[in-house]
C-alpha cells in the first residue's frame, strides 16, 4: 500500500492553512480523507469536517457517517454547495428535512434564508411570520418559484409576511395572493380577513384589477378588487 507523500501529511506535520487548502484538493491520496476525519481538532469543528463529508472522493461509508453527525449549519453548507458530491447534497438535504420539526424558531429563521430548494415548501408551511420573512429574502428565490408556492389555503402568517416583503409590488404575486385569498376566506378558522387583500389591490393597475376580479368567487372580495370607473354621460 502506498503512503501519502510528505506534502500530504496531516497536522501537526503540515501547517493548518496548508491542510485547509488540501481539504479542497480534487485528488487527495487514498486514505487521506479518512485520516483527516479522525483528527480531534477537525471533529470539534463541524464546518471544517463538512469538507471531508462533501468531498467528491470521500468513500460512501465515510460520507454517510460524517453527515449523520453534522449539525444543521454544516448540513446547510453541504446542501447548498454546488461543488459537493451530489450524494452528499442529497443526504444533507434529507437530514435537514428530518431536523426541521425539532429546530427552534431562531434556527429555522437562520436556515430559511439559505435553505436548499427541496426545503422551500416545508418552510412555506411554517406558521411563523419571522421565519417566512427570512425565507422571502432568500437570494435564490425567484418570482416563478414564489408564485408556485402561493396556493390555498393561504394562512395569515403567509399573507402578512408577503405584504411586508420585497415582493409586495410584484403584479404576478399580487394576482396569485388574491386568488389564494379568495379560496381561503371561507375556510373554517382561516384567520383571514378582507383587509389582507388591500396591499395586493394597490399593487395592481386598473386593467389588472379588472382581470383579477373576473377570476374571483367571493362577491365581497370581487367588489373590493374591481376598479370603480366613473362613467361620463
Region locations from a protein language model:
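Alpha-helical scaffold segments
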Residues: 1-233
